[in-house]
Each structure stands twice: as structure tokens, then as C-alpha cells.
């Protein structure tokens, strides 16, 4: 499978192009996808790139003055609902990429032995728990053509951003998630 030239996770064609062509942007977008609308979370890497004034680079972000990075995240508009904590988490994520993957986000998945190894690597990243890691395995497999053996077993088996093919799907997914949450609450789960 050839990777797409766009991932339709935002209203911005430029941001959608960045997500499809820059693995660090995609990983940061996934990191930001919590307690914040999906389309805004995945627009965050474009805002960050614009404010940094150059392509996203893990080494540069990891070395950035944290107070300065927090200001960049504050905007306006803010890159995330919690700009200070997400600036720190983004910096921590980039530091791990520098320390363990030579600063190349693609090394995270290109050198994974299989889907289980990829999942384990993602879960070790700052801000990536079990659920977010499984969703990202799904994004890589379903949208980007990154399919190490066993990726389907490691990917999320519930509706997620990995299932979004058009921007309208973002709203459909949001409604499905609300219904799932309501059903879970009603069942006492």
C-alpha cells in the first residue's frame, strides 16, 4: 500500500498533507489527541511547524527551551487545551526519539520486529498508553501502509481516528464514540 498524500483528519489541506508526509507530525498529532477535539489535535503539528518557522525536527524540539516551547503552544490560538503540559510532553516525546531512535520517527516503526514490538515501543513513549498506542498502530497500518507482521492484532479493535478516510468521518466517529460512552455508562461499565 502506498501512503496517501493527505490524511483527512483536519479541515486544513496543508495540515492534512503534513500529517501524511511527516511521521513526527502524525505522532505529535496522536499525542495531542486527548481532552481536545480530534481535528484540532491533529492540526496542532501544523501550528507548531508554522510557529517554529521550519520543518518539525525531534532534535530541535527536544533541545528547545521549555518556557519558550510553552509560549509557542499557548498561541493564540493554543495548540492544545493544556498548552504547558502538552509542550512538555511533546518535548519529552522528541527526547525519546532522539535518544532511542536517532531522532528519526520512522525508525520507531521501520525497525520494529512485528506488530507486538511496535505496540510495545509506542507504549513506552511519553503520553502513549495502551489505547492510544493501539490506535496509532491502526493509523499506521490502515492509513500509512506500515504493516509489520501481526499489526492487525496489535491495532485498536474499536472505532478510532484510524478509520477516518474523509473529514466528514471525524464527525461520524465523534458521534459513535459518544454513543459507545453512553452505552457503557448505562450498562454500569
Language-model features, listed with the residues they occupy:
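C-terminal accessory module of base-excision DNA glycosylases/AP lyases that mediates lesion recognition
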Residues: 1-16, 21, 113-124, 130-189
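Structural motif
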Residues: 14-25, 36-37, 80-85
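Short acidic alpha-helix initiation/capping motifs at coil-to-helix transition points
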Residues: 20-23, 38-41, 48, 112-114
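Amphipathic alpha-helical interaction segments
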Residues: 26, 43, 47, 88-92, ...
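Short, aromatic/basic-rich helix-turn unit that serves as a nucleic-acid recognition element
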Residues: 27-31
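Short helix-capping/linker segments at secondary-structure and domain boundaries
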Residues: 34-43, 97-103, 144-148
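Alpha-helical ds-nucleic-acid-binding substructure associated with the helix-hairpin-helix region
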Residues: 48, 52-124
Amino acid at each position: 500500500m502506498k501512503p496517501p498524500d493527505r490524511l483527512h483528519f483536519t479541515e486544513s489541506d496543508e495540515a492534512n498533507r503534513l500529517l501524511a508526509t511527516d511521521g513526527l507530525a502524525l505522532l505529535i498529532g496522536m499525542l495531542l489527541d486527548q481532552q481536545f477535539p480530534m481535528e484540532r489535535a491533529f492540526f496542532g503539528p501544523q501550528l507548531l511547524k508554522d510557529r517554529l518557522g521550519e520543518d518539525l525536527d525531534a532534535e530541535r524540539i527536544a533541545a528547545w527551551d521549555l518556557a519558550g516551547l510553552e509560549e509557542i503552544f499557548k498561541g493564540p490560538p493554543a495548540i492544545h487545551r493544556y498548552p504547558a503540559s502538552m509542550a512538555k510532553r511533546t518535548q519529552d516525546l522528541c527526547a525519546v526519539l532522539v535518544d532511542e531512535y536517532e531522532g528519526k520517527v520512522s525508525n520507531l516503526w521501520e525497525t520494529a520486529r512485528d506488530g507486538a514490538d511496535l505496540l510495545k515501543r509506542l507504549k513506552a513513549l511519553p503520553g502513549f498508553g495502551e489505547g492510544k498506542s493501539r490506535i496509532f498502530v491502526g493509523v499506521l497500518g490502515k492509513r500509512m501502509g506500515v504493516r509489520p507482521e501481526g499489526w492487525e492484532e496489535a491495532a485498536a479493535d474499536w472505532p478510532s481516528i484510524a478509520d477516518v478516510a474523509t473529514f466528514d468521518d471525524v464527525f461520524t466517529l465523534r458521534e459513535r464514540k459518544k454513543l459507545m460512552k453512553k452505552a457503557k455508562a448505562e450498562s454500569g461499565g
